[in-house]
Amino acid sequence: MTSRFGHSHHPRRGRSARARAGRREGVQSNFPATQVLERSAHSLPARERTALVMAGGTGGHIFPGLALAEALRERGWQVHWLGTPGSMEERLVPPRGFAFEPIDFSGVRGKGLKTLLALPLRLARACLQARAVVRRLQPDVVIGLGGYVTFPGGIAARLARKPLLLHEQNSVPGMANKLLSRLATRVYTAFPNVLPDAQWVGNPMRRAFTRQPRPERRLAGREGPLRLLVVGGSLGAKALNDIVPQALAWIHEQDRPIVTHQSGESQIEALRRSYAAAGVEATLTPFIEDTAAAFAEADLVLCRAGASTVTEIAAVGAAAVFVPFPHAVDDHQTTNAQYLVKVGGGWLVQQADLTAHGLAEMLQNMKRQDLLAKAQKARTMRKINATRDIVAACERLAR
C-alpha cells in the first residue's frame, strides 16, 4: 500500500554594501527613463543569466537549494551546483537537470586532530578549485545554503567580486554561514534573530507546501482512528523506529491510529521486523514522494525537528510531536522545534524522555479538535515567500 500521504528585517547593508548595491542595482541617470530603456533594449543583446548554488551534506541544506534552483530555472536562469564528489548533493542534483561542479572538501568536526591539522591545506586547495569554477562560469550571483562546501565557494565568489547571497536554514547558524555572513551581499534566514543584519524570509520550499487547504477544511468531517505519520528522514530515525511500534502495541487495536511510517532505505527492513514483532500493522515506506500531501492528510506528524521539516509543517499547518535529534550540532533541532512549540503549534519531546508507554498514553489522549488547534497555531507561524524574495534579489543583482 502506498501512502498518499517561513520580523522582517532590512537587507544587509554597510557602507560598502550600499556602494556595491549602487553599482549592481543601477544608479540614477541623466537620461529620461524611456530613453534609457530604449537604448538598453537596442544596444544590449539578450544574455542568459547564470547562478551558482552551493549546498551540501544533508537534505536540510540541499532541498531548499533545489527549490531555489528550480525557481531560477523557471525564470530562464542557467543554474550550476557546487558540491563534493560522492555526496548526497551529487546523488540528488544532476538527476534534476542541474550541472554539478565538484570540489574536494569536507567537514572537520569530530574527525580527529590529524584532519584538523590538515585543514589549512585542504581549504586552500578547495578555494582554488572553487575559484576555477567561478572564473569559468562567471555567474551573475552565487547562492550559499550551508554545508562545508559553501565556505570555499563563498570565498571564491567574493575574491571574484560576484554577488554572494546566503541563506541559513536553522535557528542556530552553521559555521560556514556564520563566517561568510560578514562578507555576503545579502543574508537571509529561515528563523528570526539568527544572524546580524539578516532578513528573515523563511525557508525556500516547493509550492506544494504552500498550497494545501487550511487545517479546518482538511479536518472537517473526519471520523474514525487518528491518522499518524511518522517521518524519520532520508537516513531514518532509529529511536522512532524502535519505540513507535512498541507504543502502538500498548493501544487497543480498535483505538489504534492508522499509521504510515517513513524510514530511510537503510533501516526499512529493521523497521518491518519491529512492527512484526509488535504485532502492529502499518504502511512502511523508505521515501515519501509527496511530503506536502502526506502532512496535509495526517492528523498528527511524529518527526525530527530539522529546519525543513519544521518550516514545511508550519507552511501546511499540521499538528506535530517533535523529537529532536540529540546529537545535532549546537542542539539546533531543539531550538528549531521551539519556534512552533512556544506558540502552541506542537509538542516537544526529547529523545531521552521518549518511551513506548508515554507515547502510547499521549496518543490515546489526543482528540482531533485539539490537533486542529495545534495545526492552526502552527500555520500562523509560516513564512512562505522565501523562494520568491531570494529569486527577486538575484534578478535585481544580475541587472
UniProtKB/Swiss-Prot annotation:
GO terms for molecular function: UDP-N-acetyl-D-glucosamine:N-acetylmuramoyl-L-alanyl-D-glutamyl-meso-2,6-diaminopimelyl-D-alanyl-D-alanine-diphosphoundecaprenol 4-beta-N-acetylglucosaminlytransferase activity; undecaprenyldiphospho-muramoylpentapeptide beta-N-acetylglucosaminyltransferase activity. Residues 1-30 are annotated as: Disordered. One of its GO terms (biological process) is carbohydrate metabolic process. Its EC number is 2.4.1.227. Its main location: membrane. GO terms for cellular component: plasma membrane. Pfam families: Glyco_tran_28_C, Glyco_transf_28. It is found in: Cell inner membrane. Signal peptide: none annotated. Belongs to the glycosyltransferase 28 family. MurG subfamily. This is UDP-N-acetylglucosamine--N-acetylmuramyl-(pentapeptide) pyrophosphoryl-undecaprenol N-acetylglucosamine transferase. It comes from Acidovorax ebreus (strain TPSY).
